[in-house]
Swiss-Prot record:
Keywords: Cell cycle, Cell division, Cytoplasm, Cytoskeleton, Microtubule, Mitosis
Family statement drawn from the similarity comment of this UniProt entry: Belongs to the HAUS4 family.
Protein function: Contributes to mitotic spindle assembly, maintenance of centrosome integrity and completion of cytokinesis as part of the HAUS augmin-like complex.
Pfam families, per database record: HAUS4
Any one Gene Ontology BP term: spindle assembly
Principal cellular location given in the protein's record: cytoplasm
The UniProt record lists the keyword Flavoprotein: no
Gene Ontology CC: one annotated term: centrosome
Protein name: HAUS augmin-like complex subunit 4
Species: Mus musculus
Subunit details: Component of the HAUS augmin-like complex. The complex interacts with the gamma-tubulin ring complex and this interaction is required for spindle assembly. Interacts with EML3 (phosphorylated at 'Thr-882').
Localisation per UniProt entry: Cytoplasm, Cytoskeleton, Microtubule organizing center, Centrosome; Cytoplasm, Cytoskeleton, Spindle
Amino acid sequence: MASGDFCAPGEGVEMLLQVCGKQFPPCALTEEDLIQNPRFSKLLLSLSQHVDESGLSLTLAKEQAQAWSEVRHRKTAWLRYEILQRVIQELLVDYYVKAQDTNLTSEDKKFHETLEQRLLVTELTQLSGPGQETELPPLLGLERTDLLELMPPSQDFVWMKARLQLEVEEQLKRKCFTLLCYHDPSSDTDGDTLKAAKVWTLTEVLVREKQQCLEAKSQQKEQLVLLEKKRTTYSQVLLRCLALLQRLLQEHRLQTKSELDRINAQYLELKCSAMILRLRMEELKVLSDTYSAEKVEMHRLIRDRLEGAIRLQEQDLEKSRLVLHTYEALGEDFESLVREYTQLRLAADNKRWALQELSKAQR
């Protein structure tokens, strides 16, 4: 394919612009850029076949997806363990609070004491167990076998485990209902069966709402980019219109010879000047909206330095003109003085050279 025909205006350019907008967002290319640089356009089209919408290569994107999948899997496992750990801690805290206010039954006391003992021994066993990088002395001088002896009886553990499952399920159920009522306050008056049905689909609802939020955020970003482009275009068009109006006003000023016409011309001139000032004010307003205060201040500094340099050059030029006028006023007498000074300078140089040679000969 010829380079001149690669990016001819049409559907090919539109397709390439869409590809660049999705896969190469920092480029911000225009249709004119693609038409004027066909080889670069061909390079972008070739690169688009090897990268995804985020700009990553397909291989790297696949590896990243696998890594994120592994991270999500490990995060899910950790969250399950962390949730169970926190629920058990909350059960123990509730037990301590109830023990201060009410008299608990013997079964409740036995359940919480067995749970606390089992949890404490398990944590100490993990701290003193293998799997550490460096050899550390036993915790408090206790070996793993010493800690295992502190475990509650097996029949108590089996009974506690069966009840713990019910307690954890009830605690998680209350938390799920609380989350559901926070997300949908109207569900507060529903029955447990209806709440359980809504909780079952709550995950899908949250995922769908999150996806909608992400899509809305992406659309908002695209709209902001489009709005910025339109704002720049409208500002440029408005500036051209203001310049055209100013030129038309200056070209069509009325000029008359009579006094009345002169007064009318002065009035129209003042009116045009006011209009020009107003147009200038609008132009400055558009420029202030287009350029930031830092850019305006930088332009002002550059202009001040250039004006200062111009003034210095004009002063040097004026001094040079004065010296030139002085030399021109002297005329032929000044030229004779220059020739005489040149002869004396040459004679002095010759005598100085002779003295140097004589001194060398004497040494």
